[in-house]
Amino acid sequence: MLAQFDVNLVVLLVLLICGLLSQNAAVTIAADVLIVIKITPLNQFFPYIQAHGLNLGILILTIGVLTPIASGKLSGESILKSFISFKSLVAIAIGLLVAWLGGRGVKLMSSQPDVVAGLLIGTVAGVALLRGVPVGPLIAAGLLSLFIGK
């Protein structure tokens, strides 16, 4: 009986419950999709998802961030003004820092997958307890890389 106990499935179920309790659609849907893939023949796609999922997610996120520029909601004038306002210049600097941290986070999560569970637990807890949003794992991993020197 113990040989058939799947700890990874239990972790996904716990994440699903946390997502539901915290009303976090992203965590809920992600856990749901991964559970379905795991318990069906679709599990043959896990190597592809592991190899390309993070990059695909970053691509979709980038499209979402750039959409206001493409749609015209963020005007060219507003973009140009961002280079002369102190507040906007600070925002640009922080954006650069966060992007750099995210890059470090991707590298750390790829090279040291043992930290992923802790980062996910912290992110889900932050969403559930602090009403945060689930953009934390990459930035958290980037910050962690500064502390552990990777």
Swiss-Prot record:
Main subcellular localisation: membrane
Query: Which Pfam families does the record associate with it?
Result: DUF441
Q: Which UniProt keywords apply?
A: Cell membrane, Membrane, Transmembrane, Transmembrane helix
Query: Keyword Ribosomal protein: yes or no?
Result: no
Where in the cell is the protein located? Answer: Cell membrane
Q: Where are the transmembrane segments?
A: 1-21, 45-65, 83-103, 115-135
**InterPro entries assigned to the protein according to its UniProt record, in alphabetical order:** UPF0756_TM
Regarding the membrane, this protein is recorded as: Multi-pass membrane protein
Recorded GO CC terms: plasma membrane
Q: Which HAMAP family match?
A: UPF0756
**What PANTHER family has UniProt attached to this entry?**
UPF0756 MEMBRANE PROTEIN YEAL
Give the similarity note: Belongs to the UPF0756 family.
What is this protein's record name?
A: UPF0756 membrane protein ABAYE1440
* Organism of this sequence: Acinetobacter baumannii (strain AYE)
Q: What is the lineage of its organism?
A: Bacteria, Pseudomonadati, Pseudomonadota, Gammaproteobacteria, Moraxellales
